[in-house]
């Protein structure tokens, strides 16, 4: 199945894959290497703060990785890094997807810790995190947090209310030194055709 999907993506002109939101099967990484795909290898979907598991609620009991983060995050991340670091297609390590800590004072301390593990084990690759709150309301990602990330990942810039049509322009002007990547974005239209995956 993976081979067929990756070959379809290649036919569409895609040259990179984001693994989300946990370490992928090594067989997928082997295929990406074989077929010439760049890869963003991602470790976590939650840190200490749980995500809402149901619409409109963040008060229910967590059944996610946040329950195990303190006990397992260092071992889990280091295991992924040591296992995957020799895959030539990997171009970025991702330490998280839409992590609630991005809006919390002190959240950057965890970002520094996790990035540190990545840089210690593999100093050749940059570290990213997929942010979905960069210009969100009422709380947005803190610059103190994003400043600790090598490559700031932008998720769904088109949904940020008054900035919805500005996309990356405002940040490009305000943060000239910020390296960014679109980590999760819908197509602006179905230009190339529809593909059946």
Which ranges hold each PLM region?
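Active-site-adjacent "gating/activation" loops or surface patches in catalytic cores
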Residues: 1
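Substrate-binding/catalytic cleft of secreted carbohydrate-active enzymes
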Residues: 5-9, 16-197
